């Protein structure tokens, strides 16, 4: 388990590095895609179940854990940090409002990344 956590931490740090260093958009997206193809873990599954039952602390956990990464990810598409934050907030509002009906097969983060990407592309249309 410790090895898996170390690998995930390494992936996370590398994703952050690519985003900060301004590598080309596709390279950054490929790193994120590779990092997020993991299945939902037991901790996230438990916290997500609590959130689906209306627990705001569980929602706050996901918000605080992924907010910055999602904003950076959306900003790749929009190149506008303020609009990126608005889109991520909209994604979280949707996530909270539909919590009882959402079925996540991969990780929570990959679900939020996909929702953020879709909302960003809709914004650009």
Q: Whereabouts are the PLM-identified features?
A:
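Short, charged helix-capping/linker segments at alpha-helix termini
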Residues: 52-61, 71-90
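N-terminal module of bacterial RNA polymerase sigma factors
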Residues: 1-68
């Amino acid at each position: 388990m410790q090895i898996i956590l170390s690998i995930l931490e390494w992936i996370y740090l590398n994703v952050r590095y690519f985003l900060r260093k301004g590598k080309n958009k596709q390279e950054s997206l490929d790193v994120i895609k590779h990092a997020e193809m993991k299945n939902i873990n037991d901790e996230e599954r438990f916290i997500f179940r609590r959130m689906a039952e209306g627990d705001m602390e569980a929602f706050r956990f996901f918000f605080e854990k992924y907010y910055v990464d999602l904003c950076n990810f959306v900003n790749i598409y929009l190149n506008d940090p303020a609009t990126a934050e608005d889109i991520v907030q909209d994604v979280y509002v949707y996530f909270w409002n539909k919590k009882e009906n959402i079925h996540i097969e991969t990780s929570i983060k990959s679900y939020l990344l996909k929702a953020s990407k879709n909302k960003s592309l809709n914004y650009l249309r």
